[in-house]
Curated annotation (Swiss-Prot):
Source organism of the structure: Carcharhinus obscurus
Record's GO cellular component terms: myelin sheath; plasma membrane
Gene that produces this protein: MBP
Protein's name in the database: Myelin basic protein
Positions of region (Disordered): 1-24, 82-128
Classification of source organism: Eukaryota, Metazoa, Chordata, Craniata, Vertebrata
Family classification: Belongs to the myelin basic protein family.
Compositionally skewed regions (Basic and acidic residues) per UniProt: 11-23, 96-107
Membrane-protein topology: Peripheral membrane protein
Main location group: membrane
Domain of life: Eukaryota
Record key words, sorted: Cell membrane, Membrane
Location in the cell: Myelin membrane
Length: 128
């Protein structure tokens, strides 16, 4: 259970759903959120986000084991620095629209290249 691989998949596979607002919220999250907001809306959505971050930032740090060069650090910086710090309460408002276009552009292109670069340890140029 790592972080890097599902970033790639949800980045590119969830792009077609960018038009729907509930789907937009799950674009930068995991498929778990997709099921969550269907089942119980905001409530489960929130806990799924929390679970996602607990899993991501746990002391075991599955991400670091998977990509132990610069990627884990870059991933963390990317998540918390960009949209990760306000996915569950920002998605309803401002972050919704920008996630829509982020999903379209960054989904396949920048996001994947970001991880290729991040593994080499060049996280910052990819973030811009």
């Amino acid at each position: 259970a790592g972080g890097a691989h599902f970033f790639g998949q949800e980045g590119s596979r969830k792009v077609p759903e960018k038009g729907k607002e509930p789907a937009t919220r799950s674009v930068l999250m995991a498929p778990t959120l997709h099921k969550a907001h269907q089942a119980a809306g905001r409530q489960t959505d929130d806990s799924a986000v929390v679970h996602f971050f607990k899993n991501m930032m746990s002391p075991k740090a599955p991400v670091q084991q998977k990509a132990r060069s610069g990627a884990s650090r870059a991933i963390t910086k990317f998540i918390w620095g960009t949209d990760g710090q306000r996915p569950h309460y920002g998605a309803s408002g401002s972050s919704k629209s920008r996630e829509a276009y982020r999903g379209r552009k960054d989904g396949s292109g920048t996001l994947s290249s970001f991880f290729k670069m991040g593994k080499k340890g060049e996280g910052s140029p990819a973030r811009r």
